[in-house]
């Protein structure tokens, strides 16, 4: 499932970040790697998705969230 599909207050784990090297560099620089656990804080349709991961609150734009495969934990 994509990150945009998880509801607020749900926990998940990053399953795959895709193969786009520019995208991989960007998301790994903010601490998101495969296997990273997180909690969805906010997921409104027109706003960035807010997640809490590695003791940090991150806002990820929706188009990037479509590239991130997750599994519910």
Locate the predicted segments by residue.
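Short, charged beta-turn/beta-strand-edge "cap" motif at the junction between a beta-strand
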Residues: 1, 20, 42-47
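Short, conserved secondary-structure segments in the cores of folded domains
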Residues: 2, 26-28, 48
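A residue-level detector for short acidic-glycine micro-motifs
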Residues: 5, 16, 40-42
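Short, structured beta-strand/loop micro-motifs enriched in basic residues and often containing a Trp
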Residues: 10-23
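C-terminal structural segments of small proteins and small subunits
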Residues: 12, 43-73
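Short alpha-helix capping/helix-loop boundary micro-motifs
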Residues: 22-26, 36
